Amino acid sequence: MRSGLAATLEGRASPPDQQVFGQVCRPVGERAKAVAAERGWQVLQMAARNRNAAHALDAEGARVSRMFEADAGLTAVWLRSSMNGTPGMRYFRRITVEASCLACHGARDARPAFVVTKYPDDRAFDFKPGDLRGLYAVFVPDSLAGKE
């Protein structure tokens, strides 16, 4: 979903604005939240170089992020985990920077105005295609494992 929506940015004459963000990036987050609510899972987007501090890596995410950094071919990791005392499985999926991502995550000085204004503490820039942008983290409680 993310790749398909981001591809709509390619070849644009004007820089992305808040409206484009709402059509390209926001739907991915909204879909993740909907799936999480529907199934009782926790779904997060996390990154070391985040735009929003709420998306900072936790200790487990930092460990998995280092694994992804060390092995560009590694796309996913499952771990036994617990959240707030609840045992379960945690699935991590890498987010790899694509050329279309550079419209907002490329050179610091080339970021769209809405990004600079909305995210004054932004650290999600100066990426290149193929870089690790971050990861999706999905926690599935044992009590829900195998249930659809």
Predicted regions and their residues:
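Extracytoplasmic c-type cytochrome modules immediately beyond a signal peptide or single-pass transmembrane anchor
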Residues: 1-98, 110-148
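Detector for the c-type heme attachment site
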Residues: 102-109
